[in-house]
Amino acid sequence: MYKSLLFCLKIFVFLILVGCGITAYIIYHYSRDLPDYSQLARYYPPSVTRIYSRDGKLMEEYAFERRVFVPINSVPSSLIESFIAAEDKNFYNHPGVDLFGIVRAAFLNISNYLHHRRMEGASTITQQVVKNFLLTNEVSLERKIKEAILSYMISRVFTKDQILELYLNQTFFGRGAYGVAVAAQNYFNKSVEELTIAESAFIAALPKAPSELNPERNYARVKARRDYVITRMFEDGYITRDAAKEAMDSPIVLRKRAKEETVTADYYAAQVREEVIRMLNSKEVFYTGGLTIITSLDAKMQQLAENSLRKGLREFDRRCGFRKPIANISLDNWQGELKKLPTPPSLLEYKLAVVLDVADNHVEIGLIDGSKSKMPIAEMKWARSNFKSVKTLLKKGDVIVVEAIKEGYALRQIPEVNGAIMVMNPNTGQVLASVGGYDFSTSKFDRVTQALRQPGSLSKTFVYLAALENGVKPNQIFNDGPIEISQGPGMPSWRPKNYEGKFLGEITMRTGLEKSRNLITVRVATAVGLTKIVDIIKRFGINNEPKKVYSMVLGSIETTLSRMTNAYAIIANGGKKVEPHFVELIKDRNGKIIYRRDDRECLACNVSDSNLDTAILEIPKEYIYRVTDEASDYQITSFLTGAIDRGTGYAAKKLGKIIGGKTGTSNDSKDTWFVGFTPKIVVGSYVGYDTPKELGKRATGSNVVLPIFIDFMSNAYKDKPSLPFKVPDSIKLIAVDSATGKITPGGTVIEAFKVNNVQMLENEDMIDNQDNNDIFDYVPSKEDQSQEIY
């Protein structure tokens, strides 16, 4: 008996030794080519880059993997306990591999197999870290062995908190969310610190099947999985019975990010993306670096700019008349047929409808949701001039675009024309709003920065400015009559015309710009010379290499809305160089500032909120680079404010603000523009077809684009004070007759003369012979409503 026991013991010891030897060999064999796990100590996961408006609203997120790194000491204990209960009960006690868990799972899975239940896994959190970081998802014995070896080795080198930090930040939770921080934001619009026990349990339940555990598709299954995690938390002693019951009784309510926390600015965000990638010289850093980018964007102005542009494009498109229905379908199953139709691009808030019945003064329409409504003829009047019966416009089965209004629905169509709008601070160059087209989802081409178009009359401003720089006085008389320009041997003479083909005769230079007279502009250009005009176009950044031809003075050069708006920003700020910029600040994933647009002292920091709108934050002199002298700049500003009060921008006068501005219309009305400004804001807008063609015989900047500016300013600037443009010491204000240009105390316009020219004026025949010693010391009274000062 004793010998038998001894023999069995020897066999047992031998088998143990053999087993240990085999185990040692396996460990040695598979340890030779293990990946380097020391890299985990240098964990910098790909993280989402977020772009914000200047008032902290989220504009856009960019990432290969949407992740925000959160350190373990910022993760609440309830969330950690949820994962421990759900994934690895013995996490704090085992050495990376849970042998007891493996045995338990093996016996449990026998029962699960017999009862057709889901199999239990025994993979620890450490093993999942190894699989996610160091190995592939290959299902093989070799991978499992390597996984176990690495898990043990990692547990000896890294603390449990370090392993948890890796796991919680790397794991995929569905809906494009990597890591618990983005999961909390995606599902509940909360930070991890704000999660309840029930919400923590929900997130901890996701890694098992993140794509399948969707409460919007399978609520019962998701709730059962969440409640299982809560039960485990109670059984493991993390929460009380009452807390568990309360958590299980709570419904799963997903919450999206609140609308007021975000701003839609797709074109702006795309411009920021390109700008930052250029700055960093790395697309990878942008998409993986977890950057926080603060921009110049004003969320309110951005929304208003987008609304104004879309409204203006739609109104112009409707003026061109109704094109045709989208399709014609059978009414037998009209709802089903309507659903089959592809959604037209750029439908936005509009809806598709089918005409069910047609009467003389209304139509009955059906919508995709099966509802019906009547649309009166009054909401279709724009479609065709002087039509009296709807039957001449639409028929049964026609598929049309409609817009919901208070009284029902109105006939609409998606504009074919496109355009852009840009809003700048002229003193800092901050781009406050930028909308590069009607709909970003349909066309990502940015018409603010990418579209090269002819500015038409917008370029006239710089012809007149060149004249003022070179000593031509603002009351100089020019002849608004026919002119012929020689273009050299073998070339036909150039005979420019005014827009409407009429002549005004002898008028002042000011009136020439205010009324946008082509022939006056050409005569001013001949007086100054093309060389100086080319120079000023370059200086203001409108075009770097303009062709030295006379047609350029009427706008035949090409430029972008961004360049042209910036050129007018220089005028608005008194002639100082400024460049448009979108990005204010960039922080890396750790909050370290890696870029700041301006390191100068914050000039606005000591200005109270109540005074901010009236404060003009000037650039310190050591930072100033002048593009033009302040006297000439003030003179052209005075001309441009006159264009609003008496000229082509007159419609904007109803805004009740001191505004300068200029319309622009290119040859054949292919491009229409308007740029308007105050001392604090510059707004540029453009409308035209992407493939240039005539907008219409009577289409001009005044009737196509100026309404966009007016709509924007009436909403964005209605509560702002009207600020005057600062009169420099080098300017003398003198009353003149706007018709003759002669200086007179009873003049209808207060003209801005350079101080060094005033003495010369006394010797010229431009002064009415009146006995008035104060003619050159005019100080207007507030009561004098007939004279205007800018």
Curated annotation (Swiss-Prot):
User: So what EC number does this one have?
Assistant: 2.4.99.28, 3.4.16.4
- Compartment(s): Cell inner membrane
Q: Which reaction does it catalyse?
A: [GlcNAc-(1->4)-Mur2Ac(oyl-L-Ala-gamma-D-Glu-L-Lys-D-Ala-D-Ala)](n)-di-trans,octa-cis-undecaprenyl diphosphate + beta-D-GlcNAc-(1->4)-Mur2Ac(oyl-L-Ala-gamma-D-Glu-L-Lys-D-Ala-D-Ala)-di-trans,octa-cis-undecaprenyl diphosphate = [GlcNAc-(1->4)-Mur2Ac(oyl-L-Ala-gamma-D-Glu-L-Lys-D-Ala-D-Ala)](n+1)-di-trans,octa-cis-undecaprenyl diphosphate + di-trans,octa-cis-undecaprenyl diphosphate + H(+); Preferential cleavage: (Ac)2-L-Lys-D-Ala-|-D-Ala. Also transpeptidation of peptidyl-alanyl moieties that are N-acyl substituents of D-alanine
- Keywords, A to Z? Antibiotic resistance, Carboxypeptidase, Cell inner membrane, Cell membrane, Cell shape, Cell wall biogenesis/degradation, Glycosyltransferase, Hydrolase, Membrane, Multifunctional enzyme, Peptidoglycan synthesis, Protease, Signal-anchor, Transferase, Transmembrane, Transmembrane helix
Q: Please give the Gene Ontology molecular function terms for this protein.
A: penicillin binding; peptidoglycan glycosyltransferase activity; serine-type D-Ala-D-Ala carboxypeptidase activity
Which chain positions lie within coiled-coil regions?
none
Active-site residues, as the UniProt record annotates them: E87, S457
Q: Which GO terms describe its cellular component?
A: outer membrane-bounded periplasmic space; plasma membrane
Coarsely, its chief localization is membrane
Fetch the SUPFAM superfamilies from UniProt.
Answer: beta-lactamase/transpeptidase-like, Lysozyme-like
Q: Where is this region: Transpeptidase?
A: 398-711
Sequence intervals crossing the membrane = 7-27
In the record, the note on similarity to other proteins reads:
In the N-terminal section; belongs to the glycosyltransferase 51 family. In the C-terminal section; belongs to the transpeptidase family.
Query: What's this protein's name?
Result: Penicillin-binding protein 1A
Which organism was this protein described from?
Rickettsia conorii (strain ATCC VR-613 / Malish 7)
